[in-house]
């Protein structure tokens, strides 16, 4: 198992980044929030999970071990493969996912594309006991994110995805104004992307 990769970022795409490890460029699939934290030319470390199929080897990367472990946990549920597991973590932060599973929150889980009411009920039934105490400790001691830092990181990520600086700034400001207390970077990025829609 490849537990993590570290090296300079060669490129960042819409759904993956290429990180050079020992002279080899490794394509690592990740969520938009994780990709937003990567900068071309800078060194990065991602916690990874290697999915082996008969015709492919696919590497998935995460900002921390908790997200990587949840990615693996999700795939122990019936009908959940790596794509749906990654989509779930793209929509729900690790602490949100843990709370939704432990509390039986179907509404939160059905925010994920591809997860309907029956699928959400199955996830809760199969994973609630496996989440354990993570839900109660995932966000313990976390500091409130700085509004200026969040604004800057999300704007840079949107520009990197092909939106203009003006579009990025306007969408981020709109999301922050609507949210009131500042959200974390991944939440603001998701809402900004939803507001902007697909890039023309």
Curated annotation (Swiss-Prot):
A GO CC annotation given for this chain: Holliday junction resolvase complex
Region (Domain I): 1-63
Annotated SMART domains: HhH1 (SM00278)
Quaternary structure annotation from Swiss-Prot or TrEMBL: Homotetramer. Forms an RuvA(8)-RuvB(12)-Holliday junction (HJ) complex. HJ DNA is sandwiched between 2 RuvA tetramers; dsDNA enters through RuvA and exits via RuvB. An RuvB hexamer assembles on each DNA strand where it exits the tetramer. Each RuvB hexamer is contacted by two RuvA subunits (via domain III) on 2 adjacent RuvB subunits; this complex drives branch migration. In the full resolvosome a probable DNA-RuvA(4)-RuvB(12)-RuvC(2) complex forms which resolves the HJ.
This protein's domain notes: Has three domains with a flexible linker between the domains II and III and assumes an 'L' shape. Domain III is highly mobile and contacts RuvB.
Similarity comment text for this entry: Belongs to the RuvA family.
Record-given protein name: Holliday junction branch migration complex subunit RuvA
Organism name: Saccharopolyspora erythraea (strain ATCC 11635 / DSM 40517 / JCM 4748 / NBRC 13426 / NCIMB 8594 / NRRL 2338)
């Amino acid at each position: 198992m490849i537990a993590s990769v570290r090296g300079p970022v060669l490129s960042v795409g819409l759904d993956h980044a290429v990180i050079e490890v020992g002279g080899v460029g490794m394509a690592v699939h990740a969520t938009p929030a994780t990709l937003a934290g990567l900068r071309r030319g800078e060194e990065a470390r991602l916690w990874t999970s290697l999915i082996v199929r008969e015709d492919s080897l696919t590497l998935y990367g995460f900002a921390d071990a908790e997200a990587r472990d949840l990615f693996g946990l999700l795939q122990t549920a019936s009908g959940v493969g790596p794509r749906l597991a990654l989509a779930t973590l793209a929509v729900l932060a690790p602490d949100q996912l843990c709370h939704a599973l432990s509390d039986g929150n179907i509404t939160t889980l059905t925010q994920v594309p591809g997860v309907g009411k029956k699928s959400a009920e199955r996830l809760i039934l199969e994973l609630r006991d496996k989440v354990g105490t993570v839900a109660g400790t995932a966000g313990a001691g976390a500091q409130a994110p700085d509004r200026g830092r969040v604004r800057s990181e999300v704007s840079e990520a949107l520009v990197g995805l092909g939106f203009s600086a003006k579009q990025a700034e306007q969408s981020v400001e709109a999301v922050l104004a609507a949210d009131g207390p500042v959200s974390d970077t991944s939440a603001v990025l998701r809402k900004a992307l939803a507001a902007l829609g697909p890039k023309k």
